[in-house]
Amino acid sequence: MSEDHHDEEQFDSAESGAAATFPKQCSALRKNEHVMIRGRPCKIVEMSTSKTGKHGHAKVHMVAIDIFTTKKLEDICPSTHNMDVPVVKRREYILMSIEDGFCSLMDPESCELKDDLKMPEGDLGNTIREALEKDEGSVLVQVVAACGEEAILGYKISTKE
């Protein structure tokens, strides 16, 4: 009996249970909206619809870019079918420091610290690093979260006053 109680505690401590995706009819999707393709959260960059043929529904052809890897993905779906749409959240954090490739971030509203995000690779990471070193103002990074993943996808400088 005590084992059952232990299982309940583990269940209670789980995440909030908010869904990572919601369904939306394929024909209702639009360019620049988000959609799940092959299990990845993507932003639609092109859409085209084929006419209804003698063997079924009109088809929607989508070209989308993975919001985290920037890889191009394509999908074709009957217009009446539902597709999963990821819940994408964007937040700004103040970049405090960079240590061992990880960013130390502060939420400007709650002042809570966050230090579990990797510095982006390539040009974006280099320009953010340079902006922090120049110390021309606070570096605000844009963090995008979807489907259990988080990444820094942009930044801006908030000048000192």
Swiss-Prot record:
Organism domain of life: Eukaryota
Localization terms from the record: Cytoplasm
UniProt keywords, alphabetically: Cytoplasm, Elongation factor, Hypusine, Protein biosynthesis, RNA-binding
Positions where Hypusine occurs in the chain: K54
PANTHER family given in the database record: TRANSLATION INITIATION FACTOR 5A FAMILY MEMBER
SUPFAM superfamilies documented for this protein: Nucleic acid-binding proteins, Translation proteins SH3-like domain
Pfam family, one: IF5A-like_N
Protein's UniProt keywords contain Methyltransferase: no
InterPro entries: IF5A-like (IPR001884), IF5A-like_N (IPR048670), NA-bd_OB-fold (IPR012340), Rib_uL2_dom2 (IPR014722), Trans_elong_IF5A_hypusine_site (IPR019769), Transl_elong_IF5A_C (IPR020189), Translation_prot_SH3-like_sf (IPR008991)
Annotated GO biological process: gamete generation; positive regulation of translational elongation; positive regulation of translational termination; protein localization; translational elongation
Tissues expressing this chain: Expressed specifically in the germline in the distal region of gonads where germ cells actively proliferate.
Gene behind the chain: iff-1
GO cellular component, as recorded: cytoplasm
Posttranslational modification: Lys-54 undergoes hypusination, a unique post-translational modification that consists in the addition of a butylamino group from spermidine to lysine side chain, leading to the formation of the unusual amino acid hypusine. eIF-5As are the only known proteins to undergo this modification, which is essential for their function.
Family: Belongs to the eIF-5A family.
A GO molecular-function annotation: RNA binding
SMART domains with a match to the protein in the record: eIF-5a (SM01376)
Name recorded for this polypeptide: Eukaryotic translation initiation factor 5A-1
